[in-house]
Amino acid sequence: MSITHAVKHKGYYYAPDPSSQLACSIGGNVAENSGGVHSLKYGTTTNNILGVEMVMMDGTICKLGGKTLDQEGYDLLGLICGSEGLLGVITEVTVKILKNPQTVKAALIGFPTIEDGGNCVTDINSNGIVPAGMEIMLSLIHI
């Protein structure tokens, strides 16, 4: 959320939106390969980082990736992303930011059953529509 806040005035945003975004750090997101409701369209953290600097367990400072998506060699960023801090401590991250969409629309749709809601999600995806986000909310609280 801080990344999006820092670039929104220039018309950009950072796509991953983990549910912990109000309290998490980008290093923690890399360590956990965090995702969120936008993961279907934009991927998780591993799909939205270009490079990292990290301190390895022996104290060595290591830089992986760069400023472009296409890097030669093995995908070491993919190895680090989701490693839960076991391979080192992330100290710097280069992220991919996206241009804000021209329009944003939201819809809230009710369904008689969870199965009907799930079928709607399946129908949307199977027809080639990839929304920026979809969530199913259960009515567990009745007033």
Predicted region positions:
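FAD-binding subdomain of flavoenzyme oxidoreductases
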Residues: 1-135
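Conserved small/polar residues in nucleotide/adenosyl-binding loops
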Residues: 141-143
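Acidic, glycine-rich loop-and-beta core segments that form the ion-binding/anion-interacting portion
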Residues: 138
